């Protein structure tokens, strides 16, 4: 479907466009206004975002590219409740201190990928605690709650799925969709925001906000969803067997971030190049047409471009050159390192414990299975003894040992 606005044509061609509440109306708004404000919300449940949020971050960047103003809404208040969308059970309630620390970490990561200033397309960060924390309950029920039908709320997936499975849905979580709807109304009143963007699991929450806007006699609001980020195997993106793929370089080294995208399934190459890079479509088509061993060149291009956006050109080029040196030239000097103490070496440390402590495996059980499956190497020698101990003999005359989990995860273990 061809649209009148360049923005909608662009996001459709890249695969971002999933659902829209009124595509013709939004198309007209974007065409006639060179100043449109849109928002994307992020819960503050961790001290960084992970790659599961990357599509939304790219949407922020694309809004700016076309001259529109994005709002990053951080859920300083709604995180205290937790969004039930796509969840089987309620999240643990986070202390306010943790939420505030998480907000700082998320801001740090976002500022590397989106530009924030007072310009026409400069993004702004807003915390919904600014208005939700001061709400008076009775006033909220009267002025906002009266506009919501419980029957309709129960029909949305966030509630319906839990109830169909006879899983508990607390009154606290049930209120989340009212608060998110209220956020949209507040952002319209304060900033003239007309568009909310979110993952497809947010459809019900977005529709509630638009319907509330109508009942409050606000200008027409619009909602647009992007596809949920799934791998070729149908798994949600964001976590691997080794742990979460964080966007913060202090929580996941740029080298490991680069490796994550270098090792994606062949079937994901074209889709991920469209989603996560700024490469033009013509170049993407050339890369996704590569066959056999040449596919690896497309994966390297993807990994480098994605790492540039998240960590900058310098870190991306360093990650790529390190990978080439390690995997193609056999150079261990550029491997990520982990330090253990002389006392640990003297006492001996279990290989299973070390694999887990380093983060090469998420659990000791996984480390044991890796060894039993001949997937673990020490200094390029396969170890299949689950009782293997790393001690001074392991280092011999070297200052480090190379520890490998599978073909693509390697760490240099040093002694201090």
Curated annotation (Swiss-Prot):
ATP binds at residue 239. The keyword ATP-binding applies. SUPFAM superfamilies: Alpha-L RNA-binding motif (SSF55174), Nucleotidylyl transferase (SSF52374). Pfam families: SYY_C-terminal (PF22421), tRNA-synt_1b (PF00579). Its main location: cytoplasm. It catalyses: tRNA(Tyr) + L-tyrosine + ATP = L-tyrosyl-tRNA(Tyr) + AMP + diphosphate + H(+). The keyword Ligase applies. Signal peptide: none annotated. A motif ('HIGH' region) lies at residues 44-53. PANTHER family: TYROSINE--TRNA LIGASE, MITOCHONDRIAL, TYROSYL-TRNA SYNTHETASE. Homodimer. This is Tyrosine--tRNA ligase. It comes from Wolbachia sp. subsp. Brugia malayi (strain TRS). The gene is tyrS.
């Amino acid at each position: 479907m061809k649209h009148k606005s360049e923005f909608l044509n662009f996001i459709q061609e890249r695969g971002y466009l999933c659902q829209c509440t009124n595509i013709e109306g939004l198309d007209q708004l974007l065409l006639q206004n060179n100043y449109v404000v849109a928002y994307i919300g992020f819960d503050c449940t961790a001290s960084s975002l992970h790659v599961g949020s990357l599509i939304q971050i790219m949407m922020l960047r694309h809004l700016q590219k076309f001259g529109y103003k994005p709002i990053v809404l951080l859920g300083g208040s709604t995180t205290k409740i937790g969004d039930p969308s796509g969840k089987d059970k309620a999240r643990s309630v986070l202390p306010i201190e943790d939420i505030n620390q998480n907000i700082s970490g998320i801001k740090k990561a976002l500022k590397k990928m989106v530009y924030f200033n007072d310009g026409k397309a400069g993004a702004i960060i807003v915390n919904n605690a600014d208005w939700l924390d001061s709400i008076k309950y009775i006033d909220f029920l009267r002025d906002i709650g009266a506009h919501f039908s419980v029957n309709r709320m129960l029909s949305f997936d966030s509630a319906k799925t839990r109830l169909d499975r006879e899983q508990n849905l607390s009154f606290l979580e049930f209120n989340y969709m009212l608060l998110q709807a209220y956020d949209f109304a507040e952002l319209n009143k304060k900033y003239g925001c007309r568009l909310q963007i979110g993952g497809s699991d947010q459809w019900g929450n977005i529709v509630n906000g638009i319907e509330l806007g109508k009942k409050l006699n606000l200008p027409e609001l619009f909602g647009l969803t992007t596809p949920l980020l799934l791998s070729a195997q149908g798994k949600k993106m964001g976590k691997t067997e080794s742990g979460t793929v964080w966007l913060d370089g202090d929580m996941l080294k740029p080298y490991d971030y680069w490796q994550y995208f270098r090792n994606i399934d062949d079937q994901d190459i074209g889709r991920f190049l469209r989603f996560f890079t700024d490469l033009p479509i013509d170049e993407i088509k050339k890369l996704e047409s590569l066959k056999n061993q040449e596919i690896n060149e497309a994966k390297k291009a993807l990994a480098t471009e994605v790492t540039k956006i998240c960590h900058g050109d310098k870190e991306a080029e360093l990650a790529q050159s390190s990978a080439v040196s390690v995997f193609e030239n056999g150079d261990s000097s550029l491997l990520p390192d982990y330090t253990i103490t002389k006392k640990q070496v003297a006492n001996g440390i279990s290989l299973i414990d070390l694999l887990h402590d380093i983060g090469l495996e998420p659990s000791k059980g996984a480390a044991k299975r890796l060894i039993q499956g001949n997937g673990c190497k020490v200094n390029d020698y396969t170890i299949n003894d689950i009782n293997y101990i790393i001690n001074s003999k392991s280092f011999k005359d070297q200052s480090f040992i190379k520890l490998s989990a599978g073909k693509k995860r390697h760490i240099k273990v040093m002694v201090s």
